[in-house]
Amino acid sequence: MNRNEISFIYYVKIKLYLYNSFFIMSYIEMVLAIPLLGAIALLFVPSWKTQTIRNIALNSSLLTFLISLLLWIEFDSSSALFQFTDGVCSPNVYSDVTLAKAASSSSFSALNFALGVDGISLFFIILTTLLVPICILVSWNNIEVYVKEYCIAFLVLETLMLTVFSVLDLLLFYIFFESVLIPMFIIIGVWGSRERKIRAAYQFFLYTLFGSVLMLLAILLIYFQTGTLDIEMLYLSDFSETRQCILWLAFFASFAVKVPMVPVHIWLPEAHVEAPTAGSVILAGILLKLGTYGFLRFSIPLFPYACIYFTPLIYTMSVIAIVYTSCTTIRQIDLKKIIAYSSVAHMNFVTIGLFSQNTQGIEGSILLMISHGLVSPALFLCVGVLYDRHKTRLLRYYSGCGQTMPIFALLFVFFTMANISLPGTSSFPGEFLVFIGSYQNNSFVAFCAATGMVLGAAYALWLCNRLIYGVSKPDFINTWSDVNRREFFMFAPLIAGILWIGVYPEPFLDAMHCSCIYLLYAQ
């Protein structure tokens, strides 16, 4: 055989190997691999082929979303264990084996890039894969510089976020938990909308990074005591009450900044205001959930005594955040800041439910996080629709826009009503369960949190009145077009999700129920 024939044979063998390797992947491995492969493919596309770049990014993210739906279809809701895993021991079945393995581990060679999905991480994965193609669509026309780098940043960010929700090793969780900051820092700093975008990017990066230093030290302490960082093995470990409190505070320092809780929330409004619309969508829809997901995945099951001990601290900080940010929201004139401060209030309502020490509160918190991941991005998309037309986010310029943009007005009112938990929308069942769970644990806290709901309705109705029904400025808005087809396609899946959860939340609650019970009573 000549050289060309040999080269062709090797080429065919490599293609067959890659083909077979791809199709023997588990669903979760495919979900992680596709956006990363899309980002790698974009490296070889010339920068001037912007339409090709956008198509590759959109198709990669859409394919990832479709495969993530297969996770839900194949998911066994009767099991509390991690699913779609390869070679990961189940703590309920192999408890003696895993404990022996943990005791015998003596080096970081025991680190294992194991992936798995349970009823808690399932919906965060689906939510992530849903929002990324929406981000690509919203940036279709308004990102004109460094388009290739922009799409690569979002696809890499998607891979990192999905890995955070699916990795089963504590140190690897920390690595990807912090790695998410890098592409988001670039997105805010390069494609932000105003002169202060560099300051906002550094503020976002440094606030969230410094809070995680103590968490890294806590992870090392956990490893030296248990000899393992495998999440399933750690659920079987036992820490003294004093050590639980120390470790809990170290994890709290990292997760509280990500939520964010008062007083470490200052970075969020600035980051939202300066970020491009797609950056705000990801920031509100996914990145704010990383902190509460960390509480749920680690703080509650690993440190049960410390959770009970520090519950008054969580309740106090959460109630202050809800009331303070709700009052602050009423005084804002920037549309993005209004939505950003309302996000702080909603996420602190989530923390109240997480530490209610009962399944109603925890399930309600997860449902509320999913709802917030649909409603808040939708509101930021609405602001983006207005910003694309006149490059300002100040409320006073858009008074009476409902007269010239009736479809937009209908969408904005719908999403605003969902934001204040109108029955029939996605926020209502989540907030109702959180209220029931917190009332069972502390009725006074539930009452204080309910005042935040009233304040939320006040600023939401005030916003609708000013924006939709105010006195119009004909010279400013008469030439605007209403929501176009591309923009409606962005809103459609969010509308469907909000109505589905609001009318029929049972499939979501069924999938997460066993996992919530297991985490709550893991020890």
UniProtKB/Swiss-Prot annotation:
One of its GO terms (cellular component) is mitochondrial membrane. GO terms for molecular function: NADH dehydrogenase (ubiquinone) activity; ubiquinone binding. It is a multi-pass membrane protein. The keyword Glycosyltransferase does not apply. It is found in: Mitochondrion membrane. Its EC number is 7.1.1.2. Keywords: Electron transport, Membrane, Mitochondrion, NAD, Respiratory chain, Translocase, Transmembrane, Transmembrane helix, Transport, Ubiquinone. GO terms for biological process: ATP synthesis coupled electron transport; electron transport coupled proton transport. InterPro entries: NADH_Q_OxRdtase_chainM/4 (IPR010227), NADH_UbQ_OxRdtase (IPR003918), ND/Mrp_TM (IPR001750). The chain crosses the membrane at residues 22-42, 62-82, 120-140, 149-169, 170-190, 204-224, 246-266, 276-296, 303-323, 338-358, 366-386, 404-424, 444-464, 488-508. Its main location: mitochondrion. It is an enzyme of class 7 (translocase). It catalyses: a ubiquinone + NADH + 5 H(+)(in) = a ubiquinol + NAD(+) + 4 H(+)(out). The keyword Transmembrane applies. Core subunit of the mitochondrial membrane respiratory chain NADH dehydrogenase (Complex I) that is believed to belong to the minimal assembly required for catalysis. Complex I functions in the transfer of electrons from NADH to the respiratory chain. The immediate electron acceptor for the enzyme is believed to be ubiquinone. This is NADH-ubiquinone oxidoreductase chain 4. It comes from Prototheca wickerhamii. The lineage of its organism: Eukaryota, Viridiplantae, Chlorophyta, core chlorophytes, Trebouxiophyceae.
